[in-house]
Curated annotation (Swiss-Prot):
The keyword Endoplasmic reticulum applies. It is found in: Endoplasmic reticulum membrane. Keywords: Endoplasmic reticulum, Glycoprotein, Hydrolase, Membrane, Protein transport, Transmembrane, Transmembrane helix, Transport. The chain crosses the membrane at residues 121-141, 744-764, 790-810, 867-887, 914-934, 964-984, 1001-1021, 1033-1053, 1056-1076. It is a multi-pass membrane protein. Involved in inositol deacylation of GPI-anchored proteins which plays important roles in the quality control and ER-associated degradation of GPI-anchored proteins. Residues 58-70 have a biased composition (Polar residues). Its EC number is 3.1.-.-. Residues 1-90 are annotated as: Disordered. It comes from the Eukaryota. It comes from Aspergillus oryzae (strain ATCC 42149 / RIB 40). This is GPI inositol-deacylase.
Length: 1102
């Protein structure tokens, strides 16, 4: 006979239609015996299973498994129990004055058969939705795996590393001496050192590894620094006299700590960095450890090089209280997520990021340099590009933090002579890249200054020369810029430009007439040429060498395949005509002694012929594409500007078709440069025909740049072709939809942790609505089907409209804000958090991603549902096997069921108190949450086994309820797992100091109490008053928050679910008549005998 935990269903047409989808099971007999409310309450709390057996008259008679006496339910007319049966005196009534529970037994027969369903079946609608979601997810993952990110052309470095631990940097200098270590790198056979003298004679450089990174990752950079100084620099007297010395590479061993997941760990590392910097500088004051020239000033600053989160640690160090002013003035980071934290699962990491970024923005917003503590600091952020699948390269942008006068972001594919995209690890060892880094550092150091580096403006000029292509508007030039001109001069050759005094083959000079005057020397310019031919004229040409402005381009020949092939690059010059206003002649001097195979192309071109601006929208580009034909009389360089192509979410296909090609031999094959102004990303394609275009432009969730106009230029394509060939060129650009799907993985990977919680919350909301109205707790699959037919589509539609409106509002200028008068005029008008909501997109075009993510989330939820059901089924089978093997169930009594037993209330209270006490002192609350998840899994397994054996409504209700709570907690578990992983790592490295955070007992107490309440097998009471809307509102609020803020502030999802758990605990306590006197009885041990909620079946003693 099926029994309900509380109440009976109410006649409701809507719920009746829901229950009537499944035909009722045939009854085994004509008679159904109903029990009164007290008997049903006892069944709900003790979990006692009832087996129907027929007597001689054919009537159904219940018998408890653990009782030897037959029990017949009293009739409804009975008002009291017999004197020898006092079960009513020891039972706690489910109903309460605050949360009355419906107790009418009417209409039970109509709903009961349809509710005893297996959790495995799902509706056709749910299955179809999951199928479509699986197709979408398959193509997204396939596109991500097959996307075109460029080949791996990195050379393998050669090194002979030696790491010397700084044992003197002990607890006297830092409290982290037992956790972290400081090392010095020495290259074997190159760097002289001994145990007594470390051989420090250069500029100190400190390397900071990233999240779970090793200090040994520095060996490729440090080895190149040692060998370059030994082979090149030390033989150059001019550079030595200019203050260039070797680089002494130090490195910190963070013990592979995970700063990306824990804000306090990030702060601890930054504190240790400042203490290490102070210790490193002190080493140069000790003549026993240093071989520096005593006439040189002692170093007062250290250059920081950080990889991944090491770059964030470097920036954080400058905001700490133990930071020595001006002890750091140069920071170079590689694949560092400056703009946003990689994951937002920890509140500390989100708040720490905000404090760091606010400090840097405020510092650079000061009017006067004396008020800016970072005035002398230069920050260079280098990103690997699309090959980096660990940290989105969009996050490496510092355009929202640092003005162009103090730093910039550049991609490795932009750096001259590198031209390679790199993954998260290869950026630390790639041979071409490490050479560029080290050479740039050697140019910025100056040991004649106490800061060990050149002034900030000079450092920025050097970094731009080494890291930018030279074609950017911010690139440094020897010839001063005069402004934008309508004409330009370009020169391309496959030879190298000679500097003044070099003995090469080609020299380019910009000359002006320089009449000599008496007493005036002719050495003011790099070269003076006399073309008078022996006549009496005194007019000469005074010239400047253009080699410093030379730009390296990848060599593009008919046999070229990749831009990073180890061949001699092309040399290129480009000037606006106004930049040459002071000169009258361009002299190209062929200095070769014998004929050489090569070419030189130079021309003056008009911007109207060389610049094409495509004025079309993204919709037109998506529907029809873009087609451009270049005429045969085109300039050597043609620039195609497409402002509509600015999003990081779309990929494109570019095709270049040459007409009438092959009639004349070309001097070089077409060369294409794809570029974005902010951040500085350039990609080169040699011998170009077909190009897969992907870029890092406007990306989701990125804060706006300090200069809003920086992102308005879109993408530009520079095409170099041989103008001597009489052939037209057709260029076509189309959106690559299949390739664009792969871009969603890196930009929206955390969405798949937030959006599924929206679906789970709406499903559980429907489950509680049906339960409060009918008394039946439907399965998760039924709830999902019901949500798909009602609330879920409406919520996704509302979120889509919200995403479109948010993207539209971000495009309005500050003056269009109707509330702009409320803002203080001294405050920055830029809202750096405006892209934190929902999709984080600044383009209303992508509103359709909301229903796509919702669709995928439904499929993911159903798949995880079946994975969890399979796990519970497996554990249930093992649990049942052990119970039967132990002899608890005999074969002849397999129809009889055991009682859902649990520990006494006193023991459960003590266990919970101990766990909470540990949370407040030693362990983080994330550990207690994991314990709660395990306990809830065990409860779900036991409930599933009892439901399968009992086949009663009460047991099915509780099994479905326990499973849904477990599924909800399972989706919250990843948010807590990362901090738990950091804590476990600290234990492994024998760091037992408790976290200074994550010990808030209130953050876990509701979960612990809810899980403990469910271990008794007690079904949560129904709420039939208006308080039932509170449950619905809490679930709905969790769903909305998951969609709007779930990506940027995922850690709050735990706290919102914690509030929900507190409400459910409140329902339990309200129905059980919780009071302080009862709590006292539990502590004294009396409740263990009287409270049936503990799971024990109490018998009356004779």
């Amino acid at each position: 006979m099926h029994r309900r935990s509380s109440g009976s269903p109410v006649e409701d047409d809507a719920e009746d239609s829901l229950s009537s989808r499944i035909p009722p099971e045939p009854s085994n007999g004509p008679n159904v015996v109903d029990t009164p409310e007290k008997s049903r309450s006892q069944v709900a709390r003790t979990g006692t299973s009832i087996d129907l057996r027929r007597d001689a008259t054919g009537a159904s008679t219940p018998r408890s498994r653990n009782s030897s006496m037959w029990r017949t339910p009293p009739s409804s007319s009975m008002t009291s129990n017999p004197p020898d049966c006092k079960s009513s005196s020891v039972m706690m009534p489910l109903a309460s004055q605050r949360l009355p529970i419906e107790a009418s037994p009417d209409h039970q027969r109509r709903y009961r058969p349809s509710r005893l369903r297996s959790p495995w079946p799902c509706s056709i609608l749910t299955a179809f939705t999951t199928l479509v979601a699986s197709i979408f997810l398959f193509f997204i993952l396939r596109s991500f795996a097959l996307r075109q990110t460029g080949g791996d052309g990195c050379g393998v470095p050669v090194m002979s590393p030696t790491f010397i631990r700084m044992v003197g940097f002990d607890t006297e200098h830092t409290r982290f001496a037992s956790k972290y270590n400081l090392y010095l790198y020495r290259e074997g056979g190159v760097d002289p050192y001994s145990q007594e003298n470390l051989g420090l004679n250069g500029v100190p450089v400190l390397f900071l590894p990233g999240n779970a990174g090793s200090y040994r990752q520095v060996r490729s950079l440090a080895a190149e620094a040692s060998r370059h100084y030994y082979d090149v620099v030390r033989h150059d007297e001019d550079r030595l006299n200019a203050g260039t010395r070797s680089l002494d590479f130090f490195m910190i061993d963070f013990n592979e700590d995970m700063a990306a997941f824990h804000g306090q760990t990030l702060l601890d590392q930054a504190e240790y960095v400042n203490e290490a910097v102070a210790y490193i500088l002190s080493l140069y004051h000790d003549p026993r450890r240093s071989r520096r020239d005593p006439e040189l000033p002692d170093p007062s600053a250290v250059v920081l090089v950080g990889h991944s989160m090491g770059g964030i640690v470097a920036r954080t160090a400058l905001t700490m209280t133990n930071y020595q002013a001006n002890s750091v003035n140069t920071i170079v980071t590689m694949s560092a997520p400056h703009a946003k934290p990689p994951v937002s699962f920890d509140s500390d990491i989100v708040q720490t990021y905000k404090q760091i970024n606010d400090y840097w923005r405020e510092a650079y917003s000061q009017t006067w340099a004396n008020d800016n503590p970072l005035w002398h600091v230069t920050l260079i952020s280098i990103a690997g590009g699309s090959r980096d699948t660990v940290v989105p390269s969009d996050y490496a942008s510092i355009s929202s933090l640092v003005p162009e006068t103090h730093g910039f972001t550049v991609f490795t594919s932009t750096i001259p002579d590198v031209w390679i995209g790199m993954d998260h690890l290869s950026i630390t060892w790639c041979d071409q890249f490490r050479k560029a880094i080290i050479k740039s550092l050697f140019e910025v150091v100056d040991v004649r200054r106490a800061t060990q580096t050149k002034p900030r403006a000079e450092r920025m000029r050097i970094f731009k020369k080494w890291y930018l292509t030279g074609m950017e508007t911010v690139a440094e030039r020897t010839l001063p810029r005069k402004g934008v001109s309508g004409k330009k001069f370009t020169l391309l050759t496959n030879q190298q430009f000679d500097k003044s005094g070099d003995h090469g083959s080609l020299e380019v000079l910009f000359c002006s007439v320089f009449p000599l005057q008496n007493g005036k020397p002719a050495t003011a310019f790099s070269m003076n040429m006399d073309f008078s031919g022996g006549t009496s004229g005194s007019t000469r040409l005074a010239c400047k060498n253009a080699a410093e402005d030379g730009i390296h381009l990848p060599a593009s020949t008919p046999s070229s395949k990749r831009p990073y092939d180890r061949v001699q690059p092309f040399s290129y010059l480009q000037y606006d005509l106004e930049d040459l206003a002071e000169h009258q002649f361009v002299a190209v001097v062929d200095k070769a002694n014998s004929p050489t195979k090569g070419f030189v192309l130079a021309e003056f071109s008009d911007s109207s012929d060389s610049v094409i601006r495509a004025r079309l929208g993204l919709g037109s580009l998506l529907s029809a594409g873009l087609k451009v034909r270049l005429p045969a009389n085109r300039p050597m360089l043609t620039e195609l500007q497409i402002p509509a192509v600015h999003s990081s979410l779309l990929d494109y296909r570019l095709k270049i078709i040459r007409k009438n090609h092959g009639q004349q031999q070309e001097l070089f094959a077409p060369l294409l440069r794809q570029s974005v102004a902010d951040p500085h990303e350039s990609k080169f394609f040699v011998n170009v025909k077909n190009v897969n275009v992907n870029l890092h432009g406007l990306a989701p969730f990125m804060p706006p740049p300090l200069r809003e106009q920086a992102t308005l230029g879109g993408v530009s394509f520079h095409l170099w072709t041989d103008p001597s060939c009489d052939s037209t060129i057709d260029i076509s650009l189309s959106v690559d939809i299949a390739g664009s799907l792969g871009e969603l993985v890196m930009r929206y990977r955390t969405v798949f942790a937030a959006f599924p919680l929206l679906v789970v919350a709406l499903v559980m909301r429907k489950q509680f609505q049906v339960y409060d109205e009918t008394g039946y707790f439907i399965t998760f699959a039924e709830g999902l089907d019901s949500a798909l037919r009602s609330s879920l589509p409406m919520l996704l539609l509302a979120m889509s409209l919200l995403a479109s409106s948010l993207a539209t509002s971000t495009k309005l200028p500050p003056t269009d804000d109707p509330f702009h008068w409320r803002t203080n005029s001294t405050e920055s008008p830029i809202d750096f958090t405006k892209n934190d909501l929902l999709l984080g997109s600044q383009d209303a075009f992508f509103w359709f991603l909301v229903p796509i993510f919702g669709l995928i989330s439904v499929g993911v939820c159903l798949v995880i549902n079946y994975v969890a059901l399979a796990l519970i089924f497996l554990l249930t089978s093992i649990y049942g096997f052990l119970r039967s093997k132990s002899g608890y169930i005999r074969r002849d009594e397999k129809g009889n069921l055991p009682i859902f037993s649990s520990a006494s209330p006193r023991r459960r209270l003590v266990n919970s108190a101990i766990l909470l006490a540990l949370v407040s002192t030693v362990i983080p609350y994330q550990f207690a949450y994991m314990v709660a998840c395990i306990v809830q899994l065990a409860t779900s397994v036991r409930a599933s086994w009892h439901a399968k054996e009992a086949k009663s409504t009460t047991h099915y209700n509780f099994a479905n309820f326990a499973y849904s709570i477990f599924l909800l907690m399972l989706w919250i578990l990843p948010i807590n797992a990362l901090v738990l992983l950091v804590w476990a790592h600290n234990l492994v490295v024998h760091w037992f100091m408790p976290f200074s955070s994550h010990h808030n007992v209130l953050s876990i107490m509701p979960f612990v109490l809810l899980v403990e309440a469910m271990t008794t097998g007690t079904m949560i009471p129904r709420v039939t008053t208006r308080f039932k809307h509170v449950t619905s509102m809490l679930f709905f609020f969790i769903a909305i928050y998951s969609a709007i803020y779930g990506v940027s502030y995922a850690y709050l999802l735990h706290h919102l679910t914690n509030i929900l758990a507190a409400w459910l605990v409140g329902i339990y306590f309200s129905a059980s008549g919780f009071s302080l006197s009862r709590l006292w009885r539990v502590l004294e041990g009396d409740e263990a005998v009287q409270n049936p909620a503990s799971g024990s079946h109490t018998k009356k003693k004779p």
